[in-house]
C-alpha cells in the first residue's frame, strides 16, 4: 500500500518503486527519499545500505523523507504494537530493522506547508 502525505507535489514512477520494494524483500515499510531542498524542513535519513538506522530533523544527511512510503498493513499489525503516530511506528520498525529506504527518488518533489512554499512551487513545476 502506498501512503502519501497530502502536502506532496511530485512526479514519481510507481512501477520503479514497486520493483525496488520487491527487490528489497518486501519490508514492512519502505520510505521514498529525496535530496534535501533549501528552505524545506524534513526528516533526514541515516542508513546502512538501505536499512534505516535513524531519522533526525536536526542532524543533516544527503537525503530526507518525502512523506511517500510503501507499507504492508498486515505485517505492521502482526509485528508492531498499535500506534497512530508514524514517528513511533518508524522507531519501532528501526528497532527490528524493518524500516527501509528506497533507491528510487521522485523526478520532481516538493511539499506545500505554507503560502511561501506554494509561491515557490510554480518555479519548480514549470
Describe the role of every protein-language-model region:
Residues 3-5, 30-31:
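Short catalytic-loop micro-motif centered on adjacent basic/acidic residues
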Amino acid at each position: 500500500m502506498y501512503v502519501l502525505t497530502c502536502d506532496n507535489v511530485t512526479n514519481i514512477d510507481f512501477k520503479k518503486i514497486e520493483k525496488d520494494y520487491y527487490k528489497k524483500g518486501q519490508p514492512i515499510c519502505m520510505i521514498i527519499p529525496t535530496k534535501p531542498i533549501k528552505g524545506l524542513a524534513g526528516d533526514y535519513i541515516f542508513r546502512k545500505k538501505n536499512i534505516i538506522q535513524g531519522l533526525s530533523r536536526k542532524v543533516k544527511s544527503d537525503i530526507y523523507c518525502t512523506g511517500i512510503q510503501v507499507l504492508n498493513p498486515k505485517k505492521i499489525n502482526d509485528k508492531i504494537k498499535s500506534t497512530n503516530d508514524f514517528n513511533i511506528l518508524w522507531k519501532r520498525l528501526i528497532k527490528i530493522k524493518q524500516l527501509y529506504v528506497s533507491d528510487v527518488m521522485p523526478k520532481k518533489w516538493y511539499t506545500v506547508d505554507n503560502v511561501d512554499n506554494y509561491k515557490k512551487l510554480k518555479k519548480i513545476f514549470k
